[in-house]
């Protein structure tokens, strides 16, 4: 089956960053760590990213760009790439999901889905 050639497993884990957040100013910062594993049989390079970030008010930010953290990693079968970044929203909870555009060494483009992450700040007492 051709699909097994072009497979990436994406795991993402968010964490609230209290030191960089400002509840009084409606700024909630979430760091996240992403692990991308080439589970297919074809080497491939991450070309670009597309994130959809939604806050509790259903305000959506779409973030698109080349690569991740300044890199366009090339992953051989079984190889893993990890990186960390952050997102800001204006409510204490929301979600993030998206996809990476990949290009296999044979020239085929495919998408690696980023599973939805729930962003939740701990309860803040006023």
Swiss-Prot record:
Superkingdom field: Bacteria
Domain ApaG: 2-126
PROSITE patterns attached to this UniProt entry: APAG (PS51087)
Listed GO biological process terms: error-free translesion synthesis
HAMAP family: ApaG
Name of the protein described by the UniProt record: Protein ApaG
Source organism of the structure: Chromobacterium violaceum (strain ATCC 12472 / DSM 30191 / JCM 1249 / CCUG 213 / NBRC 12614 / NCIMB 9131 / NCTC 9757 / MK)
